[in-house]
Amino acid sequence: MRERLRPAVERDWPEIAAVLQRHGLPLDGAADHLADFVVAESDEGICGVAGLEVHGEAALLRSVAVVAPGDGLGTRLVTHVITQAEARGIRDLVLLTTTAGAFFPRFGFTAVSRDDVPAALRTSAEFQGACPASALVMRRTSRHAELP
């Protein structure tokens, strides 16, 4: 059965937190932005998640995780969240990753320095220590990128 994507709701938080923890992703600040998260749901429950942390006209793409990688669900989730961001007029997306630097270029993300990140995003929990300083910073501006 193909997973159904839907907006996250408050009652999803325990399952979302479990998926994120299983992948070693930070929980700091995630619950505060749950209204901008999407989950993938199968008959067994939540099997994937991706979220936005919106700060003005820019957003942090965060908390991208799937229970069983390799079936394209991660691509579906990221594409969905990017499309939602663009529909809201958000054209500048940034992410931090320690493990998935090879996954995100297909969506138009390129490596940048922390200094290239909009100031509003540098105040997020992820930039303030939830992600290690060694994390790769990637940025996507929609006017320069096509989705897979």
Predicted feature residues:
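Conserved active-site alpha-helix within GNAT-family acetyltransferase domains
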Residues: 98-128
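Conserved acetyl-CoA-binding loop-helix of GNAT-fold acetyltransferases
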Residues: 71-85, 95
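Conserved beta-strand in the GNAT
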Residues: 39, 44-54, 58-65
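A generic "binding-loop/recognition-motif" signal
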Residues: 12, 57, 99-100
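Short amphipathic alpha-helix that is part of the acyltransferase structural core
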Residues: 1-29, 41, 135-137, 141-148
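A short, internal acetyl-CoA/4′-phosphopantetheine-binding micro-motif in the GNAT/acyltransferase core
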Residues: 64-72, 99
